[in-house]
Amino acid sequence: MSPEVTCPRRGHLPRFHPRTWVEPVVASSQVAASLYDAGLLLVVKASYGTGGSSNHSASPSPRGALEDQQQRAISNFYIIYNLVVGLSPLLSAYGLGWLSDRYHRKISICMSLLGFLLSRLGLLLKVLLDWPVEVLYGAAALNGLFGGFSAFWSGVMALGSLGSSEGRRSVRLILIDLMLGLAGFCGSMASGHLFKQMAGHSGQGLILTACSVSCASFALLYSLLVLKVPESVAKPSQELPAVDTVSGTVGTYRTLDPDQLDQQYAVGHPPSPGKAKPHKTTIALLFVGAIIYDLAVVGTVDVIPLFVLREPLGWNQVQVGYGMAAGYTIFITSFLGVLVFSRCFRDTTMIMIGMVSFGSGALLLAFVKETYMFYIARAVMLFALIPVTTIRSAMSKLIKGSSYGKVFVILQLSLALTGVVTSTLYNKIYQLTMDMFVGSCFALSSFLSFLAIIPISIVAYKQVPLSPYGDIIEK
């Protein structure tokens, strides 16, 4: 049988090969990550809770004072931990991206998964041998030296972009995010129950961390032995490019791809001066929008675990797991949002919808007093994942396929660096304001989210419809 399938509207399309699907790697690694994140928070809380009790046994303090002290200790731990997680990949992530582009696409994925596994083993040994929590800084550094999440996710995005056409790329990348969200939801839902399986000071969290190590091991073995690199989707070279549509939708994705514009001009639509190719300012504006928005998201995500442990919410282990799972439902709703909005909106419009969604939810989160209010605020953030994923998709249409690895690594490292600064800043703001207005960090995130709309609006203004099919050029 022929390796290709004929499509009357698009010519020859490559046959689907299940071994090229990166989703199993994403799912298993994310289950491991969600179990690890919940386990890390609960283990650190238990460690500082025990230390706090012993240090103040001789001079009893009010419960509120002890809670504040524990919150500050956990916050200070995460400041250092996030600094290590954010800075350590700088030594290796770009190099792995370059090696992936030059030699083999799986290099960055496999190396970063090895680092994931080693860091999960570090948490397991901390629980098993009752090591001090400072050991986890070393585990995080080891993870970063193997590329960390920056190298892993840029490799995943490169594989997803490589095997998809421009018109399908937004859905392809958001589908990978959907798989990540579903896996994170399942892992978070189970995390609180797994943490409580072995009670007692020495065994608490052992089953949870062991499950995390098992999932990380599966992801590494699958990427090494099963995963294959997909073939690049070639563009038609001698005919007007067909409009790329998404199965089951009425409209089309509006493309930013300069090559399609060149092909259209070659068949009778000559470009006017300055309009042949998108300016570099478009990529720069997309970068700025992604970074400002990521500041808001990372700050909120970093503060939420501390916020839910403190009064007035004061959640237990199971409630913490459920709260983390609620955050992962955003992956599902964002995927559905892309499918619906792509029928009638351009990429820039979808990005702004997501930013408004997150900014509104963060503003509500600042005034949460009850558990049900927390879930309402999270529900308002239902499209919060759309912006960064759609920005990646738009950028991939402006660069050559051979540069996917390097460009995605640069973007991911930029987000990681801003995340390091944001984590430190937000944790310090939280410590200073938790007695006055505990929701101040969420209010700041809301402001930054709406601020990120400005560069995206400029990109949208520079785009003008060229044809009824939705192709766009710049002013």
Curated annotation (Swiss-Prot):
GO terms for biological process: cyclic-GMP-AMP transmembrane import across plasma membrane; innate immune response; negative regulation of T cell apoptotic process; positive regulation of nucleotide-binding oligomerization domain containing 1 signaling pathway; regulation of T cell differentiation; T cell homeostasis; thymus development; transmembrane transport. Proton-coupled transporter that delivers pathogen-associated or danger-associated molecular patterns to cytosolic pattern recognition receptors as part of the innate immune response to microbes or tissue injury. Has selectivity toward muropeptides that contain the amino acid diaminopimelic acid (DAP-type peptidoglycan muropeptides) including Tri-DAP and tracheal toxin (TCT), common in Gram-negative bacteria and Gram-positive bacilli. It is found in: Endosome membrane; Cell membrane. The lineage of its organism: Eukaryota, Metazoa, Chordata, Craniata, Vertebrata. Induction: Up-regulated in keratinocytes upon differentiation. Residues 45-78, 130-138, 194-205, 304-320, 369-370, 428-435 are extracellular. CDD domains: MFS_SLC46A2_TSCOT (cd17450). It catalyses: N-acetyl-beta-D-glucosaminyl-(1->4)-1,6-anhydro-N-acetyl-beta-D-muramoyl-L-alanyl-gamma-D-glutamyl-meso-2,6-diaminopimeloyl-D-alanine(out) + n H(+)(out) = N-acetyl-beta-D-glucosaminyl-(1->4)-1,6-anhydro-N-acetyl-beta-D-muramoyl-L-alanyl-gamma-D-glutamyl-meso-2,6-diaminopimeloyl-D-alanine(in) + n H(+)(in); L-alanyl-gamma-D-glutamyl-meso-2,6-diaminopimelate(out) + n H(+)(out) = L-alanyl-gamma-D-glutamyl-meso-2,6-diaminopimelate(in) + n H(+)(in); N-acetyl-D-muramoyl-L-alanyl-D-isoglutamine(out) + n H(+)(out) = N-acetyl-D-muramoyl-L-alanyl-D-isoglutamine(in) + n H(+)(in); 2',3'-cGAMP(out) + n H(+)(out) = 2',3'-cGAMP(in) + n H(+)(in). It comes from the Eukaryota. Its main location: membrane. Residues 1-23, 100-108, 160-172, 227-282, 342-347, 392-406, 457-475 are cytoplasmic. One of its GO terms (molecular function) is symporter activity. Pfam families: MFS_1 (PF07690). It is a multi-pass membrane protein. GO terms for cellular component: cell surface; endosome membrane; membrane; plasma membrane. The chain crosses the membrane at residues 24-44, 79-99, 109-129, 139-159, 173-193, 206-226, 283-303, 321-341, 348-368, 371-391, 407-427, 436-456. This is Solute carrier family 46 member 2. Glycosylated. Strongly expressed in the adult thymus. Expressed in spleen, lymph nodes, thymus, PBL, bone marrow and fetal liver. Expressed in monocytes and pre-dendridic cells. Glycans are attached at N55. Keywords: Cell membrane, Endosome, Glycoprotein, Immunity, Innate immunity, Membrane, Transmembrane, Transmembrane helix, Transport. Belongs to the major facilitator superfamily. SLC46A family.
